[in-house]
Amino acid sequence: METLKSKTKTRVLPSWMTAPVDERKVVSVKTATRKQTAAWAQRVGAATRAPATETVYCMNEAEMVDVALGILIEGRKQEKPWEQRSLEATDKLQLSPPCSSSPGSSSEEEDSRISSLAPGLSPPRGPEASDSPCSRSPEEEKEEEDALKYVREIFFS
């Protein structure tokens, strides 16, 4: 065993591992990236301005939906106002059934309103059933329209 310890085994290393390290060749990562971006800026011709910085964000589903709704709202605001009004007017006409002139509606009118609902939707029941769609306050209609507006934008545009 002592004979094994006394002998020192020499390893043959490749030349790139045994070459002396030159101080100028060792460059930090930050300096290398700065040089690369500077070279890129010179090639593009924008050496006078700083390179653009890109930021990447990770979002969960709720944040992504919020951002998407914000983008839709901004896009909607940038559209022509008359076009938006005409779209809202046609949507409102399609969604709201006609109001009856008499306070008591006949059963035929009620049946026609119920049959005009989409399949799978039932008429409102309970205390809300006695209220006609025309007796809603403008605030309630506006809230409902806002909620449906986003759904229409997402699924039908």
UniProtKB/Swiss-Prot annotation:
Residues 80-91 have a biased composition (Basic and acidic residues). GO terms for cellular component: cytoplasm; DNA repair complex; nucleus; site of double-strand break. It is found in: Cytoplasm; Nucleus; Chromosome. Residues 96-106 have a biased composition (Low complexity). Disulfide bonds: none annotated. Disruption phenotype: No visible phenotype in normal conditions: mice are fertile, do not show any gross abnormalities and do not develop spontaneous cancers. Mice have normal numbers of B- and T-cells, but show defects in class switch recombination in primary B-cells. Mice lacking both Cyren and Nhej1/Xlf show embryonic lethality caused by severe defects in classical non-homologous end joining (NHEJ). A motif (XLM) lies at residues 147-157. The modification N-acetylmethionine is found at M1. One of its GO terms (molecular function) is molecular adaptor activity. Keywords: Acetylation, Chromosome, Cytoplasm, DNA damage, DNA repair, Nucleus. The keyword Nucleus applies. Residues 80-148 are annotated as: Disordered. A motif (KBM) lies at residues 1-21. One of its GO terms (biological process) is protein homooligomerization. InterPro entries: MRI. Cell-cycle-specific regulator of classical non-homologous end joining (NHEJ) of DNA double-strand break (DSB) repair, which can act both as an activator or inhibitor of NHEJ, depending on the cell cycle phase. Acts as a regulator of DNA repair pathway choice by specifically inhibiting classical NHEJ during the S and G2 phases, thereby promoting error-free repair by homologous recombination during cell cycle phases when sister chromatids are present. Interacts (via KBM motif) with XRCC5/Ku80 and XRCC6/Ku70 heterodimer. Interacts (via XLF motif) with TRIM28/KAP1, ATM, MRE11, NBN and RAD50. Interacts with splicing factor SF3B1. Interacts with ERCC6L2; this interaction is DNA independent. PANTHER family: CELL CYCLE REGULATOR OF NON-HOMOLOGOUS END JOINING. The KBM (Ku-binding motif) mediates interaction with XRCC5/Ku80 and XRCC6/Ku70 and recruitment to DNA damage sites. The XLM (XLF-like motif) mediates interaction with DNA damage response proteins TRIM28/KAP1, ATM and members of the MRN complex (MRE11, NBN and RAD50). This is Cell cycle regulator of non-homologous end joining. It comes from Mus musculus (Mouse).
